[in-house]
């Protein structure tokens, strides 16, 4: 049995569930902000031309508020440690088509998870 040194990094998390939008479109934005500081990520999200930046910004602000309120961390020193998007349930709708047929439409949802941690000076 090996013992590892305990890590005392404090991480604050936030989750957004059942967000309308496909997982691939949300992941391309999360890949851009992962590992960046909170301020840099907010600036990037503000000027990105994607619709998924709105819910991502909301979840990021919630994670920072959790770090500030629950752990007493300074928002200026926070960095995005983890950012992921998982597939949620699809809402099924039907569109009428020619000759009495029905065409299935899947409205996709996803779950967004963001974790922020205090920046280490190394």
Swiss-Prot record:
CDD domains assigned to the protein according to its UniProt record, in alphabetical order: Ribosomal_L22
Pfam families: Ribosomal_L22
Molecular function per GO: rRNA binding; structural constituent of ribosome
Assigned GO CC terms: cytosolic large ribosomal subunit
Keywords assigned by UniProt, alphabetized: Ribonucleoprotein, Ribosomal protein, RNA-binding, rRNA-binding
One example of a Gene Ontology biological process annotation: translation
InterPro entries given in the database record: Ribosomal_uL22 (IPR001063), Ribosomal_uL22_bac/chlpt-type (IPR005727), Ribosomal_uL22_bac/org-type (IPR047867), Ribosomal_uL22_CS (IPR018260), Ribosomal_uL22_sf (IPR036394)
UniProt keyword Cell wall biogenesis/degradation, yes or no: no
Keyword rRNA-binding: yes
Function: This protein binds specifically to 23S rRNA; its binding is stimulated by other ribosomal proteins, e.g. L4, L17, and L20. It is important during the early stages of 50S assembly. It makes multiple contacts with different domains of the 23S rRNA in the assembled 50S subunit and ribosome. The globular domain of the protein is located near the polypeptide exit tunnel on the outside of the subunit, while an extended beta-hairpin is found that lines the wall of the exit tunnel in the center of the 70S ribosome.
Assembly information from the UniProt record: Part of the 50S ribosomal subunit.
Family assignment from sequence similarity: Belongs to the universal ribosomal protein uL22 family.
Name the UniProt record assigns to this protein: Large ribosomal subunit protein uL22
Organism: Prochlorococcus marinus (strain MIT 9313)
Organism ancestry: Bacteria, Bacillati, Cyanobacteriota, Cyanophyceae, Synechococcales
Gene name in the database record: rplV
């Amino acid at each position: 049995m090996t013992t590892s040194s305990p890590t005392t990094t404090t991480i604050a998390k936030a989750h957004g569930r059942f967000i309308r939008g496909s997982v691939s479109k949300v992941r391309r934005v999360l890949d851009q902000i992962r590992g960046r500081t909170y301020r840099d990520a907010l600036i990037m999200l503000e000027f990105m031309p994607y619709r998924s930046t709105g819910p991502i910004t909301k979840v990021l602000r919630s994670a920072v508020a959790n770090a500030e309120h629950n752990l007493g961390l300074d928002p200026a020193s926070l960095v995005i440690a983890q950012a992921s998007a998982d597939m949620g349930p699809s809402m099924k709708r039907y569109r009428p088509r020619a000759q009495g047929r029905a065409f299935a439409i899947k409205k996709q949802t996803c779950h967004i998870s963001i974790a922020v941690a205090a920046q280490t000076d190394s």
